[in-house]
């Protein structure tokens, strides 16, 4: 009996000890390193370069992935799923953004633009159902078709119709002469089959579908202080049987909704700023939304 109790104690201590910090630096990191320190110390010690590698290094039990803000956007999709990315009520798995930008855009500078009519050009992007167009770092002004035809576009305006991006440059210029981008990656952060997760202090933009998508079976998960804007469909999407809290977050300029729910999900929405100028602040295609602020997670 004494050995059994001792074994349980050792197991408890081991499960606590395995939780660790993994650092990511997309400028100075290297995926051959351990990720255990924020700066390089020799060939093996130092931050990794990608969030994908950091997730592969996770072992469950409440690891923390800490992004170093290098000033350069992180250009990757993040998939948080399964036991290795789950924590406990006392020690959640964390993705700490430190104000970093997760960017899903691709340049249109060398895209195969074709002349449509007048001063309007068009191009067919990889993802055609939802899109955004950016002039440099700023979303371009979008127009919508009301009759199935390309609307009248003023210079530097665009629309999405029948799988094409239509864009009108300024007189005497071609689309290739602009610093144009569109959505080139599907979803910024996908959560699936995880529990006890905290995602904080990130900017997510330029993804074809959603900035953050809690797809299914996501439990006891908090999204805190995340700005998810200018994505093709929505800033935040909660679906399936997920239970998620979104707290002090922001969303603007998304294509179909700032926040959307579906399935049998329950979303707790605490504070935040969800600008309805481009699309409704909340679209419910199923699920339930509560706005109370309970003491527990």
Regions from the language model: what does each represent?
Residues 101-103, 173-185, 200-207, 226-231, ...:
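Beta-strand-rich solenoid/repeat architectures in extracellular/passenger domains
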Residues 94-97, 197-200, 218-225, 244-249, ...:
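All-beta strand scaffolds that present successive hydrophobic residues in beta-strands
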Residues 23-206, 213-214, 237:
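Extracellular polysaccharide-degrading/modifying enzymes targeting complex plant/algal/animal polysaccharides
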Residues 6-8:
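Sec-dependent N-terminal signal peptides
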């Amino acid at each position: 009996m004494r050995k059994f109790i001792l074994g349980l104690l050792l197991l408890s201590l081991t499960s606590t000890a395995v939780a660790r910090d993994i650092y990511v630096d997309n400028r100075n990191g290297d995926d051959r390193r351990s990720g255990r320190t924020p700066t390089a110390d020799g060939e093996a010690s130092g931050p990794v370069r990608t969030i994908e590698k950091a997730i592969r290094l996770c072992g469950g039990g409440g690891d923390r992935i800490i992004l170093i803000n290098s000033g350069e956007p992180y250009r990757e999709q993040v998939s948080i799923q399964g036991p290795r990315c789950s924590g406990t009520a006392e020690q959640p798995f964390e993705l700490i953004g430190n104000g970093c930008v997760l960017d899903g855009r691709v340049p249109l500078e060398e895209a195969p633009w074709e002349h449509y009519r007048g001063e309007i050009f068009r191009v067919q992007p990889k993802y055609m159902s939802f899109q955004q167009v950016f002039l440099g770092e700023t979303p371009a002004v979008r127009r919508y078709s009301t009759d199935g035809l390309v609307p009248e576009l003023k210079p530097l305006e665009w629309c999405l119709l029948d799988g094409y991006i239509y864009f009108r440059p300024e007189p005497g210029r071609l689309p290739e002469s602009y610093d144009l981008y569109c959505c080139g990656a599907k979803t910024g952060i996908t959560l699936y089959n995880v529990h006890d997760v905290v995602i904080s202090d990130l900017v997510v933009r330029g993804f074809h579908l959603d900035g953050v998508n809690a797809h299914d079976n996501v439990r006891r998960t908090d999204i805190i202080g995340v700005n998810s804007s200018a994505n093709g469909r929505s800033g935040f999407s909660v679906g399936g049987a997920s239970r998620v809290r979104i707290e002090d977050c922001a969303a603007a300029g998304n294509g179909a909704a700032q926040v959307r729910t579906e399935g049998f999900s329950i979303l707790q929405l605490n504070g935040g700023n969800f600008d309805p100028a481009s699309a409704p602040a909340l679209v419910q295609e199923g699920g339930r939304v509560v706005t109370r602020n309970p003491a527990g997670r």
